[in-house]
Amino acid sequence: MANNVDLSIDFCGVKFKNPFLLSSSPVSNSAEMVAKSFDAGWGGVVFKTLNSDRLPIVHPSPRMACIDYGAKKGVAVQNVEMISDRPLKDNLTDFLYLKKNYP
């Protein structure tokens, strides 16, 4: 049974074939990973903030912390991947590849 439902969206002037985008995370870390997601049907990707190669990337440690709130206890995990630690040149090469092969 064919399903011809149009899920495309226009977000701030950018057209997506569907509203499902990869987040800025390890799954969007390289052209190979992003290409696999596009081949699987994802509508887009949000990359990590790019680094100019001049800023040192420092990952916080420890990355987990216990939280005591009265009788309740919890665990918090820090987001340690807010900026790409890949060289800028590698990221730009990936963008060119993806733009050419997945316009």
Language model features with spans:
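Active-site entrance/lid segments in N-terminal catalytic domains of soluble metabolic enzymes
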Residues: 2-103
